[in-house]
A protein has these predicted regions:
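Short Cys/His-centered divalent metal-binding micro-motifs
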Residues: 116-142
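Conserved aromatic-histidine-acidic binding/catalytic patches
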Residues: 2, 6, 80, 110-121, ...
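Histidine-centered nuclease catalytic patch
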Residues: 76-116
Length: 197
């Protein structure tokens, strides 16, 4: 089985699973969201990864910087990575939106896929940007919930995070490409052009 075929199987499994959750919600009036019931979907069923302007700049500025570099080595206080894979729409909000949007009618497979490609998006941000989201109380909430479908980046705009879509499905692929572009001493404009979708 190719990686593309395997990925498609994951999407189909996720669709079947969440149809069960919707059915249970309608019968029992209970939204199953806890107990790691969505973990598989949270970290496997998403679109192409994104990266913030600041994360790109920080990576390009330092030839020793890696995806796995620790905050404490770059001015931070924590022993976790400098680059945080952050959900543009907090996953608890994605869950709520899913139940609200499909409360009456199950999504067809393509509709389901479009929903998660749009709303379950990961963006690599610099740790200071992640800290700003926490300080503003935006760790797990979106203040413009009713207009979320039109502007998934509203939460980021409140703390000046600029997310750049990429052509990569995984963070490892993105950072490997960034490392090659850094070796070639590319400017940020060229880098953005090379990684974009």
């Amino acid at each position: 089985m190719t990686k593309a075929e395997q990925k498609e199987k994951l999407w189909k499994a996720a669709h079947s699973l969440l149809l069960c959750y919707l059915d249970f919600y309608r019968k029992e009036d209970y939204k199953l969201t806890g107990y790691q019931s969505w973990k598989f979907i949270q970290w496997n069923i998403y679109g192409k990864v994104m990266i913030s302007d600041q994360a790109i700049r920080r990576f390009l500025e330092n030839p020793n910087m890696k995806k796995s570099s620790k905050q404490k080595d770059y001015g931070g206080t924590k022993h976790i990575t400098c680059f945080t894979a952050e959900h543009i729409v907090p996953f608890t909000v994605v869950q709520q939106l899913f139940f609200d949007k499909f409360k009456q009618k199950d999504p067809k497979y393509d509709e389901f896929k479009q929903f998660f490609l749009k709303f379950n998006s990961l963006c690599y941000v610099w740790y200071e940007e992640d800290n700003k989201l926490n300080q503003k109380g935006l760790r797990s909430e979106v203040r413009n919930y009713p207009t979320l479908e039109k502007d998934i980046f509203h939460r980021y705009s409140l703390v000046d995070i600029k997310a750049n879509p990429t052509k990569f499905e995984k963070g490892n692929q993105l950072f490997k490409e960034l490392a090659l572009l850094r070796q070639e001493d590319r400017n940020i404009k060229d880098v953005l052009s090379s990684i974009k979708e």
